[in-house]
Amino acid sequence: MDFTMSLVAGLIAIGAGIAVGFGAIGSGIGQGIAAGKAFEAMARQPEVRGTVQTFLIIALAFMETLTIYGLVIAFMLLNKMS
């Protein structure tokens, strides 16, 4: 019985790590692409810098929620270990 419980705890810990890792990878890639395209837009048309920057910050905040959701899921999984 002890082996089964430690196996379950280990798999839960791996699942928590995967949840945080994939969430961070996905939002990191998305943020990099969005920032790159925003800088390209600002370089082509400097007069729209304020508008593009505002939309970029809002979009980055939405993308960051993916990482936060992964962290919340990881905490929920780790609480199941107790």
UniProtKB/Swiss-Prot annotation:
Question: What keywords appear on the UniProt entry?
Answer: ATP synthesis, Cell membrane, CF(0), Hydrogen ion transport, Ion transport, Lipid-binding, Membrane, Transmembrane, Transmembrane helix, Transport
State where the protein is found: Cell membrane
Q: Which GO terms describe its molecular function?
A: lipid binding; proton-transporting ATP synthase activity, rotational mechanism
Listed SUPFAM superfamilies: F1F0 ATP synthase subunit C
Please give the Pfam families that the UniProt record associates with this protein. Answer: ATP-synt_C
Provide the site residues for: Reversibly protonated during proton transport: E64
Q: Which residues cross the membrane?
A: 5-25, 55-75
The disulfide bridges present are none
Membrane topology listed for this record: Multi-pass membrane protein
Q: Which GO terms describe its cellular component?
A: plasma membrane; proton-transporting ATP synthase complex; proton-transporting two-sector ATPase complex, proton-transporting domain
Query: What is the top-level taxon of the source organism?
Result: Bacteria
Question: What does the subunit comment say?
Answer: F-type ATPases have 2 components, F(1) - the catalytic core - and F(0) - the membrane proton channel. F(1) has five subunits: alpha(3), beta(3), gamma(1), delta(1), epsilon(1). F(0) has three main subunits: a(1), b(2) and c(10-14). The alpha and beta chains form an alternating ring which encloses part of the gamma chain. F(1) is attached to F(0) by a central stalk formed by the gamma and epsilon chains, while a peripheral stalk is formed by the delta and b chains.
Q: Which family does it belong to?
A: Belongs to the ATPase C chain family.
Q: What function is annotated for this protein?
A: F(1)F(0) ATP synthase produces ATP from ADP in the presence of a proton or sodium gradient. F-type ATPases consist of two structural domains, F(1) containing the extramembraneous catalytic core and F(0) containing the membrane proton channel, linked together by a central stalk and a peripheral stalk. During catalysis, ATP synthesis in the catalytic domain of F(1) is coupled via a rotary mechanism of the central stalk subunits to proton translocation. Key component of the F(0) channel; it plays a direct role in translocation across the membrane. A homomeric c-ring of between 10-14 subunits forms the central stalk rotor element with the F(1) delta and epsilon subunits.
Q: What is this protein called?
A: ATP synthase subunit c
Q: Say which species the protein is native to.
A: Carboxydothermus hydrogenoformans (strain ATCC BAA-161 / DSM 6008 / Z-2901)
* Gene that encodes the chain: atpE
